[in-house]
Swiss-Prot record:
InterPro entries: HB_polyprenyltransferase-like, Prenyltransferase, UbiA_prenyltransferase, UbiA_prenylTrfase_CS, UbiA_sf
Protein name: 4-hydroxybenzoate octaprenyltransferase
Stated role: Catalyzes the prenylation of para-hydroxybenzoate (PHB) with an all-trans polyprenyl group. Mediates the second step in the final reaction sequence of ubiquinone-8 (UQ-8) biosynthesis, which is the condensation of the polyisoprenoid side chain with PHB, generating the first membrane-bound Q intermediate 3-octaprenyl-4-hydroxybenzoate.
Predominant cellular place of this UniProt entry's protein: membrane
Keyword tRNA-binding among UniProt keywords: no
Organism annotation: Burkholderia lata (strain ATCC 17760 / DSM 23089 / LMG 22485 / NCIMB 9086 / R18194 / 383)
GO terms for biological process, alphabetical: ubiquinone biosynthetic process
């Protein structure tokens, strides 16, 4: 078992934390806004660990669902499950185990948060199969990656206000943007194996679609900033996020694999500066 542990870590992408961070930033945004900038540390621990565990469970489930496709894709052919280094039942067991531990984390929280966690589990578990028939599975991914937002509001306020759902919509558009960049890397392979992705659905308008999704995301955060009366610190973070989006355009405009992958990874900075703006606003407002 110990000899297989490094393979299990690779299965759940512990060597690639970018996915966990893309889940974490919007969840932290929600925790800070829901608590007026003073989130309780137990909630920070629960949601941070839950984000890591559920993303890891999702990776294991995704590799199980895509095991017959991934062997035909250059980037994924050497994944532990695809290459036969671990078995399918092991991936399922790991996914179920991690999801169960995630549920144990939220047991101290209120009933509404637990109810929302059931929905979140269903969305996360069903996402890997969306690529079979949904033309833009990245939108469904945005729901899965963003469901920590309504859960955070529920945990803090015992209700899910309108702003939480608006933030979730922003996260859906952001997810379509960065995961389309990711899909642009595998475009040729995905055409051969018949998988549906937003990069293929958007076709020659893929770059325009990515930038439009960034515009909608950042436009929604303008509404959030104005509605909540955020100050200059927030707008500095927002402006930095705009700069990130414009930088991504320079990377993806020629549709080359490695620059598109670099743009995807750089979304960690976009999410990070948005959160930094929110946190800085509350920090300065309370000083």
């Amino acid at each position: 078992m110990l000899a297989r542990f490094p393979l299990y870590l690779r299965l759940v992408r512990m060597d690639k934390p970018i996915g966990s961070l893309l889940l974490l930033w919007p969840t932290l945004n929600a925790l800070w806004i829901a608590s007026d900038g003073h989130p309780r540390w137990p909630l920070l621990v629960i949601f941070s660990l839950g984000t890591l565990l559920m993303r890891s469970a999702g990776c294991a489930m995704n590799d199980y669902a895509d095991r017959d496709f991934d062997r035909h894709v250059k980037r994924t052919a050497d994944r532990p499950l695809t290459s036969g280094k671990i078995r399918a039942w092991e991936a399922i067991a790991i996914a179920v185990g991690l999801a169960f531990v995630s549920f144990l984390l939220i047991l101290p929280l209120n009933t509404l948060t637990k109810q929302l966690s059931v929905v979140a589990l269903f969305v996360a578990g069903s996402y890997p199969f969306m690529k079979r028939f949904f033309a833009i599975p990245q939108a469904y991914l945005g729901i899965a990656f963003g469901f920590g937002i309504p859960m955070a509001f529920a945990a803090v306020q015992d209700t899910v206000p309108t702003i939480a759902w608006v933030m979730l919509i922003a996260n859906i558009f952001w997810s379509v943007a960065y995961d389309t960049e990711y899909a642009m890397v595998d475009r040729d392979d995905d055409i051969k194996i018949g998988i549906r992705t937003s990069a293929l659905t958007f076709g020659r308008f893929d770059v325009a679609a990515v930038m439009l999704c960034y515009a909608v995301t950042l436009g929604i955060y303008v509404w959030i900033g104005v509605t909540l009366g955020f100050g200059l610190a927030y707008w500095a973070g927002w402006a930095a996020a705009v700069g990130c989006a414009l930088y991504h355009y320079t990377l993806i405009k020629d549709r080359e694999r490695m620059p598109c992958f670099a743009a995807f990874r750089h979304n960690n900075w976009l999410g990070g500066v948005l959160f930094a703006g929110i946190a800085a606003h509350y920090l300065l407002a309370g000083s």
